[in-house]
Amino acid sequence: MQRFVCSGVFRQTSVLLQISPVSHCHTRRMQDSPSHRSLKQLISSQRWLNSTTALCSPTSQKTSASGQEEPDPLHDKSSGLIQRFKKTFKQYGKVMIPVHLLTSTMWFGTFYYAAMKGVNLVPFLEYVGFPDKVVKLLENSQSGYALTAYAMYKIATPARYTVTLGGTSLSVKYLRKHGYMSTPPPVKEYLQEKMEETKERISGKMEETKDRFSERMEETKDKFNEKLQETKDKVSFRKKKE
């Protein structure tokens, strides 16, 4: 009896899964149908969601946080002057802008006074090897003191940046000492807090998106199963007729 039942089930399964021209045609239609394409898109989207969720895991967050640790630019001596200037401006811009404006005014005023006292910059520029256009412009310019002061101002850029960084560092220490500026937490703790906040926001968005995709996938799966069952019924009916 068991053999008879097993053989009957086997015959029915072989009939349903047998590939004939008709079933092949229906299978191709099913593969080309919008529901089948939607199912493929949803499956690929589900894989993408899973991979993105894995990237947002605590392990990956710790790895990225450890790789992004940076020292305070005011105390970082490893980077160049320009990089320190940019990083300090990004972190302490509210303090650095007034300091830079004040020191720049003092620099330009000093150079303008030196030009009025007869400082001639042309021989120095020729000795250093500046382009002839710049040298002739200074030599024949009607602006006189202002242009000479501006040229000295640009030449002294490294010194100006160094003074600005020093003034910013002293200003930050003074403001923190008197309570006008809060002392920032260690870089590691700050980055961990930021990463946790970002992780929570991303996790919330991911859960919403995942739920929407799951609902759509279930609907598309149901439609696809109905179409597949209809095709199997048609194939089995035609086989019985034959």
Curated annotation (Swiss-Prot):
Give the Basic and acidic residues compositional bias ranges: 198-236
Major location (coarse): membrane
What spans are recorded as compositionally biased (Polar residues)?
A: 57-67
Record keyword Cell membrane present: no
Pull one GO CC term from this UniProt entry: membrane
Coiled-coil-forming residues are: 188-237
The membrane topology term of the UniProt record is:
Single-pass membrane protein
The residues covered by the DUF1279 domain are 76-188
Q: Where is this region: Disordered?
A: 57-78, 198-242
The domain of life for this entry's organism is Eukaryota
Q: Which UniProt keywords apply?
A: Coiled coil, Membrane, Transmembrane, Transmembrane helix
One Pfam family it belongs to:
FAM210A-B_dom
Question: Which SUPFAM superfamilies does the UniProt entry name for this protein?
Answer: Apolipoprotein A-I
- List locations, semicolon-separated: Membrane
Membrane spanning segments where? 92-114
Q: Which PANTHER family match?
A: PROTEIN FAM210A (PTHR21377:SF1), PROTEIN FAM210B, MITOCHONDRIAL (PTHR21377)
Q: What is this protein called?
A: Uncharacterized protein C18orf19 homolog A
Taxonomy-wise, where does this protein's organism fall, top ranks first? Answer: Eukaryota, Metazoa, Chordata, Craniata, Vertebrata
